[in-house]
Amino acid sequence: MKIQKILYRAFVFTNLVLAISFMLYTLNLTRGNDLFDFQVFYGAARNVLAGSSIYTNYGAANLPFWYFPWVSWIFLPLTFFPFEIASLIFLTTGLVIVAVVIHFLTKHYQGFDIFDRTYMFSMVIWISWLGYRVGQMSYFVLGGAVLVVFVLAREQKYLAGLCLPLLLLKPHLFLIFIPLVLWMGGWKTVLTGALTTLSLFGIEFLVTPDWVRQMLGLLTHGVGCLDTNPGWKFTTLSSLIGLGQNYVGTAALLLTIILVAVAAFVVVRFHFLPKIPLLSLAMTASLFCAPRANAYDLILLVPALIWLSEKWSIKTALIWVAATLILFLSHFSAGSYLVTVMVLALCIYKANSIEKRKRVPVFLPKN
C-alpha cells in the first residue's frame, strides 16, 4: 500500500474522531440548553397530543412554530420519550440520514470508496455544527430533498408528488428547486403533489379549523422582528451586506426578487445537465436566493459538494475544508453566505466545462 493512501486513511479516521468528539463536547457543554429549535418541534408535537394549538411560542428562547402542521406530526413518535432521550434519538436519526444520503449520491457518481464517504460524513458533522447545537431538522430536510431527487431521476413522477410535502418543511429554501421539480415531473407530479398537500391541510382543518389564522398571526408578528442576533445572523446576501432581514424574509424583497431571477437564469442556462446534478444545482441556487436562511440550512449544499467531488482528488477534498473553514471563521453568521456563493460558482464552472466538452467541433472540407 502506498504511503499516500496510508496517510489519507489515517487523516480520514482522525478527522472523523475529532468531528464526533467536538460534537459530543458541544452537546455536553450546553447540556441541551441550546436546543432551542428542537424545543419548538418537541413542544408542538406534545400540543398535538394534548389537543392544543401548535401555533404558539415554545422553549427557553420563546420561539414560534412557523411551519406547516405536518412538521409537528413528524415529531409525534418522539413525544413518548423524555426530552433528553428524544433529542438524542432525533440527532442519531439525522446522522443516519446523512450517511444514507452520502452513500446513494456517491454510489450514483461512482469512483468513491469507503474512506471518501467517511471523509464526507465527518465534514458534514463539522458543517452542521449549528444545526445539532440548536436542534434543527436540517438533516431531515436534506433527506427529503435528496429523496425527491432520486425519485425524479428514476422517472417516478407520481411518487415525486407524494413527497412534495417534505419540501414544504421549509419552502423558503426551495424557491428554485420546487418549480424545477414540478416542471420535471409534469402534470403527474403537480397533481399528486397538490392532492397530497391539500389532504394534509384538510386533516389540520378538521382538527383545528382556524389554524391558518393562528399561523398568519405568528407570521405577522415575525414581519416586525428584525434579525438582530449578534451571534448567528441569517446567511443571506441582505444580512451579509448589512441590509438586515426580518424573520419572515420580506424586509429585502426587491433584492430577493433580483437574486431569484439570477438563480433561475443559472438553472435554465444549464438545463442540459443530467437530472441529479441539475437538481443539486437548483438546491444550491435556492439557497443563493433564499429570503431567509441560517447556517444550519447550508447542509443542503451537500448534494452539490458531492457532485463537485465527482473526480475525487486532494483539490476536491479541499472544497469541503474551505466550506468548513468559512463557516467557523464567520462564526456561522452572515459571512457563511460566502459558502453558498463559493459552491454555486464552482457548480457554474463545472457545468460550463461540461458544456464545452459536449460541443462537437465542425471541420470544414478542404478545397
Annotate each predicted stretch with a short phrase:
Residues 1-159, 181-302, 306-310, 357-362:
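Primarily membrane-embedded glycan-assembly and transfer machineries that use lipid-linked glycans
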Residues 136-145, 163-173, 236-247, 319-337:
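Contiguous hydrophobic segments
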Residues 158-171, 175-182, 281-289, 322-328:
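Membrane-interface alpha helices of multi-pass inner-membrane proteins
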Residues 172, 218-221, 344:
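A short, terminal or domain-edge coil/loop segment
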Residues 310-367:
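Aromatic-enriched
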